[in-house]
C-alpha cells in the first residue's frame, strides 16, 4: 500500500501504543486508533471513560492488571451467577460496557497468552450466562473460563478472578504490607463505569460481609491479597448453578490445610543460620538386631571413620570451647593477657560463691593473647594483697604439681580491670566438664552411679591427693563435690587448689587451726569419705548417716566409707596406707586396666583418622591441579597432552557410571582403594577410558603418582 486509507486505519489499534504504551506520531497525524483519543486529561476529579457496547455472543477477556493496580482486600465481591437456561446468550439488563485499553492508566502490560508470575492456569467447568446486572464480563453459554490458580509459594500477589472480571476499575498502588486494609481503600477507587458503584449500593450485604473479614492474618504483602482471592472466589457458592468444584477447594486448602507461611519471602523449611550442628544429618549406626554379619575381610563405612558417639562428644566439646554467651554485665574486654570473657557461673550456689574466706568468686572462660589457647579464669572479688611475693610463692609451689587427676595452674595475678582489686587464678580449661555435684545431682539425665564408678573415683582422688601431699607447703583445703570435675566418662580431676593457700596467706587472721598440715591432710581423707557416702546413698536411694543402709554396696566399700567419713583413721595416715589397708591392689589394677583400655581405644581411633588425613591431603592435591580455568586452553591437558592422564584418572576414581543402570557409582571402597594405591605408587596397571569410549590408556599407579607430583610442584613453584 502506497498510502494508508484513514477510514480503514482509524479502527485499527496503533501498534506503538500496544508495544510502547504511547505513540509519538499521534500529534503528527497518525491515522491509527489511539485509546485516549476521547479521554480528557485527568484532573483532580476523575472522569468517566467512554465505553462501547459489547457485541452479542462475543467473549470479553479481561485485561490483566499489574501488581500496583490490584484491588485491595474485600474491594469487590463476586456476583457472577449462572441461570437455569443453558442456552441463554446474554443478560437482559443494561448493556455491558467494554473498557478501552489505556496505556497511561495501566502501569504495565502483560501478554494475555501467558499467566501472571506465580500462577498456574487451570480450566474450570463450563459456566452458564451471568445474572442481569452483573459487573462481570459477558459470557456466552458453554464457554470455558480460565481461572488463575495461585501459587502459594510465590512472592508476587496474584489477581483474583473477581478483580480480573472488572478491568474498568483503576486502583492506585496500595501498601500491600499494611494490615489496615478494608473500606478505606474503596474510597480511593476511580469508578469509570458507574454501574459498579450502583452494584455496591444494590448489594450492601455483600459489601458488609466482605469487609468483616479479619485483616490481621499476617505481616507480609502476599497474605492479604491471597485472602482476598479466596473470599472473592468463595462468593460463587451463593449462586444456584453448577460451580467450579476444584477451584475453591484448592484455594482454601492452599492457605489453610497447607499452612501458608506468614512471610513468603523467607521460606520456613530452612533452619535458621544460628542453629547448632544437627547430628542426625550423619548416618547413624543401625540397631544391633539389623546388623549384618560380616566376614573377616569385610568392612562397613563406619569402621573406617571415627565412631559416632565419640565424634558427637568431640564435636560438642569443640562447640563448647567456641561458644559465647552474653555477659549480662560490664565485663572488661581484656584482663591482663586474656580477652573474650565468657561467664560460666551456671549452678553456683551462694555457699559456693562465698567459700573463699567470705569473698565472692566468679568463673570465666577466657582466650589467651600469648598462645591463643582457652583457659579458665577464677576471679576472687575484692582481695587486698600488700605483699606481691605471696602470689609468686604460691604460683611456684602449685606449678610443680603434675598429675593427671589435678587441674594444672597456669597463671596467678592481681587485677583492677573489674573495678576492684581482684585475684585472678588461671587453670586449664576442659570443655563440657561438670562438677560431681552437677553430674550426679543437678543435670538431667544424671550420670548413673555404680560401685565400680565409686572405686574409680576413690582411686583417682587418692592419686591427686598423693601428688598434692607430696609437695611441701601445698594444701587444698576442703574437698567436696563442687571441687572435683568430671572431664570424661569416669575421668575426674581435682580443681580449685591454689585458692586455699593464697587466701590463707592474704587473710591470716581468719585461720584457726589451718596451720596444722597433718590435720589438713587428714581432713582431705574425711572429705573423700563424705563424697563417697553421698554418691553411694544416691545409688542405693537411702537417707541418713548410717552406712549399714547401703544395701547395694559391698562390705569392702562400706568399710572404706566408714573409716574415712566417720574419722576412724589414726592421726598419721597417708594415701599408701589407705590403699593398702582399705582398697587393695586388685581395685587399683582394675582401674588402671580400664584406663589403659580406653587409651588403646583412643589411639586406635586416632590411627584411623591419621590415615583419613593422609587421604584428605592427597584429594586436596588432586583438586588443586584438576579443573583449573587456565588449563582449559593448555594443549597438555587435552587428549594429545601428557597431563590428560590425570583427567582420566580423576574420572576413573570419582565419576564412574554403572553400565547397567546408567547411574553414578558412589563406591567408597573403590575411592579408598584407588587413593591408597596412588599414594603408595604401586606398579599395578589400570585401563583409563575417555567418556566417549573412543580413546583408552593403560598406565600404572606409579606413573600417575609421578605425573601428579610433577604437576603439583610445577604449579607451586
UniProtKB/Swiss-Prot annotation:
Keyword Coiled coil tagged: yes
Keyword line: ATP-binding, Coiled coil, Cytoplasm, Metal-binding, mRNA processing, Nucleotide-binding, Zinc, Zinc-finger
Source organism superkingdom: Eukaryota
Compositional bias ranges of the Polar residues kind: 91-100
Region feature (Disordered): 37-100
Biased composition (Low complexity): 62-90
Family: Belongs to the protein kinase superfamily. PAN3 family.
Domains: entry comment: The N-terminal zinc finger binds to poly(A) RNA.
UniProt name for this protein: PAN2-PAN3 deadenylation complex subunit PAN3
Gene: PAN3
Amino acid at each position: 500500500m502506497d498510502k494508508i486509507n484513514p477510514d480503514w486505519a482509524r479502527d485499527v489499534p496503533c501498534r506503538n501504543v500496544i508495544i510502547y504504551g504511547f505513540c509519538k506520531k499521534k500529534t503528527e497525524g497518525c491515522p491509527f486508533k489511539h485509546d485516549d483519543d476521547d479521554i480528557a486529561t485527568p484532573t483532580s476529579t476523575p472522569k468517566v471513560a467512554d465505553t462501547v457496547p459489547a457485541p452479542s455472543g462475543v467473549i470479553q477477556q479481561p485485561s490483566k492488571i499489574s501488581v500496583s493496580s490490584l484491588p485491595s482486600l474485600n474491594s469487590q465481591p463476586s456476583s457472577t451467577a449462572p441461570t437455569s437456561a443453558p442456552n441463554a446468550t446474554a443478560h437482559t439488563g443494561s448493556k455491558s460496557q467494554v473498557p478501552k485499553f489505556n496505556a497511561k492508566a495501566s502501569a504495565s502490560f502483560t501478554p494475555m497468552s501467558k499467566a501472571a508470575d506465580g500462577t498456574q492456569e487451570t480450566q474450570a467447568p463450563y459456566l452458564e450466562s451471568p445474572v442481569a446486572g452483573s459487573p462481570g464480563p459477558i459470557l456466552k453459554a458453554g464457554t470455558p473460563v480460565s481461572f488463575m490458580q495461585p501459587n502459594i509459594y510465590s512472592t508476587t500477589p496474584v489477581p483474583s478472578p473477581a478483580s480480573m472480571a472488572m478491568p474498568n476499575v483503576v486502583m492506585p498502588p496500595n501498601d500491600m504490607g499494611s494490615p489496615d486494609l478494608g473500606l478505606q481503600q474503596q474510597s480511593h477507587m476511580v469508578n469509570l463505569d458507574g454501574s459498579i458503584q450502583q452494584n455496591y449500593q444494590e448489594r450492601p450485604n455483600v459489601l458488609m460481609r466482605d469487609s468483616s473479614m479479619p485483616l490481621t492474618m499476617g505481616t507480609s504483602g502476599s497474605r492479604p491479597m491471597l485472602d482476598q482471592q479466596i473470599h472473592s472466589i468463595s462468593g460463587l457458592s451463593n449462586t444456584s448453578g453448577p460451580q467450579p468444584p476444584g477451584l475453591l477447594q484448592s484455594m482454601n486448602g492452599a492457605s489453610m490445610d497447607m499452612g501458608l507461611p506468614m512471610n513468603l519471602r523467607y521460606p520456613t523449611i530452612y533452619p535458621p543460620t544460628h542453629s547448632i550442628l544437627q547430628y542426625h544429618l550423619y548416618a547413624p549406626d543401625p540397631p544391633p538386631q539389623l546388623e549384618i554379619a560380616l566376614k573377616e575381610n569385610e568392612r562397613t563405612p563406619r569402621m573406617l571413620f571415627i565412631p559416632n558417639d565419640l565424634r558427637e562428644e568431640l564435636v560438642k566439646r569443640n562447640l563448647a570451647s567456641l561458644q559465647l554467651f552474653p555477659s549480662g554485665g560490664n565485663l572488661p574486654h581484656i584482663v591482663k593477657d586474656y580477652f573474650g570473657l565468657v561467664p560460666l557461673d551456671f549452678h553456683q550456689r551462694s555457699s559456693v560463691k562465698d567459700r573463699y574466706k567470705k569473698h565472692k568468686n566468679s568463673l570465666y572462660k577466657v582466650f589467651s593473647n600469648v598462645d591463643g589457647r582457652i583457659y579458665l579464669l577464677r576471679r576472687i572479688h575484692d582481695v587486698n594483697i600488700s605483699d606481691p611475693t605471696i602470689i609468686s610463692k604460691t604460683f611456684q609451689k602449685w606449678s610443680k604439681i603434675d598429675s593427671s587427676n589435678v587441674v594444672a595452674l597456669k597463671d596467678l595475678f592481681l587485677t583492677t580491670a573489674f573495678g576492684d582489686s581482684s585475684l585472678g587464678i588461671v587453670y586449664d580449661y576442659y570443655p563440657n566438664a561438670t562438677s560431681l555435684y552437677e553430674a550426679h545431682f543437678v543435670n538431667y539425665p544424671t550420670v548413673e552411679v555404680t560401685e565400680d564408678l565409686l572405686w574409680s573415683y576413690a582411686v583417682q582422688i587418692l592419686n591427686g591427693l598423693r601428688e598434692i601431699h607430696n609437695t611441701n607447703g601445698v594444701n587444698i583445703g576442703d574437698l567436696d563435690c563442687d571441687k572435683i570435675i568430671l572431664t570424661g566418662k569416669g575421668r575426674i580431676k581435682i580443681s580449685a587448689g591454689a585458692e586455699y593457700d593464697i587466701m590463707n596467706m592474704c587473710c591470716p587472721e581468719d585461720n584457726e587451726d589451718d596451720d596444722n598440715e597433718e590435720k589438713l591432710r587428714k581432713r582431705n581423707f574425711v572429705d573423700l569419705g563424705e563424697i563417697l557416702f553421698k554418691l553411694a546413698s544416691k545409688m542405693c536411694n537411702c537417707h541418713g548417716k548410717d552406712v549399714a543402709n547401703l544395701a547395694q554396696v559391698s562390705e569392702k566399700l562400706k568399710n572404706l566409707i566408714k573409716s574415712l567419713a566417720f574419722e576412724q583413721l589414726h592421726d598419721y595416715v597417708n594415701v599408701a596406707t589407705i590403699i593398702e589397708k582399705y582398697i587393695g591392689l586388685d581395685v587399683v589394677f582394675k582401674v588402671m586396666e580400664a584406663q589403659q583400655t580406653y587409651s588403646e581405644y583412643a589411639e586406635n581411633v586416632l590411627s584411623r583418622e591419621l590415615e583419613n588425613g593422609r587421604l584428605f591431603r592427597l584429594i586436596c592435591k588432586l583438586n588443586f591441579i584438576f579443573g583449573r580455568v587456565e588449563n582449559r586452553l593448555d594443549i597438555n591437558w587435552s587428549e594429545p597432552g601428557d597431563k590428560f592422564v590425570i583427567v582420566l584418572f580423576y574420572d576413573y576414581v570419582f565419576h564412574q557410571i554403572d553400565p547397567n543402570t546408567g547411574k553414578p557409582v558412589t563406591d567408597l571402597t573403590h575411592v579408598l582403594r584407588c587413593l591408597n594405591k596412588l599414594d603408595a605408587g604401586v606398579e599395578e596397571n589400570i585401563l583409563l577410558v575417555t567418556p566417549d569410549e573412543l580413546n583408552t590408556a593403560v598406565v600404572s599407579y606409579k606413573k600417575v603418582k609421578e605425573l601428579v607430583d610433577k604437576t603439583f610442584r610445577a604449579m607451586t613453584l
